[in-house]
Amino acid sequence: SHTITGIGDGDVFDNSTALNASLVTDDQRAGLYIFGQNRHRSAYDHDGDGYSEIPKLHGQTIGFRSFLKTTTYSKLTFEYHHMEEFRRGGDLLNRPPHEANVAEQTEHSINGGGLKFDYFSPNENHRFNVFASAQHINRDSYYGPGDRDPLDAYGNTTDLNWMAGSQYVYSFGKCIFMPSDLTAGIEFNQDKLEDNMWGYNRTVDQKVNIGSAFLQNEWKNDHWGFLIGGRLDKHNLIDHVIFSPRATLRYTPTEN
C-alpha cells in the first residue's frame, strides 16, 4: 500500500509505502510473517523564512516473525527487525549541517531480534519457556552550531542491549484451599552504552548488568484471586540486592 499526505498548502508531501505478507504451511506447523515500510517526508517551512518547522525525514523498516512447532507441545519463535531513519531540520538542508546557521540532524540504524522456545505438557499442568533477545542502536547526530566551532557539534551514540531468561509455571488442581499457578523465573539483562561528543570532550561509557529471580503463587477461582510473590534484582551499580514483594487480592461478584 502507498499513502501520500499533503502538508500545509499541499506543496510538501509525506509519502509512505508499506508491505506485508504471511505464509503458513499446510500442516500449520510453521509460519512466516514479513513486513516493511519506506517513508519519505520533505521539510516544511511554514512562514518562508528558510528554516523548517517540520524536519525532512527518510526511513525504512523491514523485519519478519516466524514460528516452528517442533512437537505437538512445543514451539520455537524467531523474529528480527532492521530500521534506518534520517532526520534533518534547520536551514540550508542541502548543505552539510556544520555549514548551516541552525541544524539538528540524526541518523539511526537499529537491528534487533529475539528467540523463544515454549513447551507445555499434554495435561497443561507444566509450562516452560526460554527466551533471549538483543538490540543494537547506532546514532550519528549533529546539534548546533551554537557559539562554538560548528565542527564540535557532531556526536555518535551506540547502545547494545540483550537479555535472556527462563520461566516455569506449574498448575495445581488444588493447593491448600483452591486451584493455583506457581510461577518461577530468572532473567539477565545487560546494556552497554557509549555516547561521544568529541568537540565538547564528553564521553559516556557505561555497562549495566541486572540479574533477577522471581517466585509467585496465585490462587484463583471464578470469584476470588490471591497472589503472593517476590522478586530479587541485583544491579551492578548498586551494592545490595533489591527485594520487591508482591501481593494482590481480587474479587469478582458475578460469574464469568
What are these regions (language model features)?
Residues 1-48, 55-62, 73:
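Outer-membrane beta-barrel translocator/receptor signature
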Residues 4-9, 25-27, 36-42, 82-86, ...:
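Transmembrane beta-strands of outer-membrane beta-barrel pores
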Residues 8-13, 24-26, 54-58, 103-109, ...:
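Short sequence motifs at beta-strands and strand-loop junctions characteristic
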Residues 15-19, 30, 60-64, 109-115, ...:
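Hydrophobic, lipid-facing positions within transmembrane beta-strands of outer-membrane proteins
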Residues 25-30, 72-75, 120-127, 171-181, ...:
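Short loop/turn motifs that connect adjacent beta-strands in outer-membrane beta-barrel proteins
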Residues 30-34, 76-78, 126-132, 164, ...:
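Transmembrane beta-strands of outer-membrane beta-barrel proteins
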Residues 41-61, 67-69, 73-128, 134-160:
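Flexible loop and strand-edge segments within Gram-negative outer membrane beta-barrel domains
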Residues 71, 177-183, 187, 196-256:
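Structural signature of Gram-negative outer-membrane beta-barrels, strongest in the C-terminal barrel
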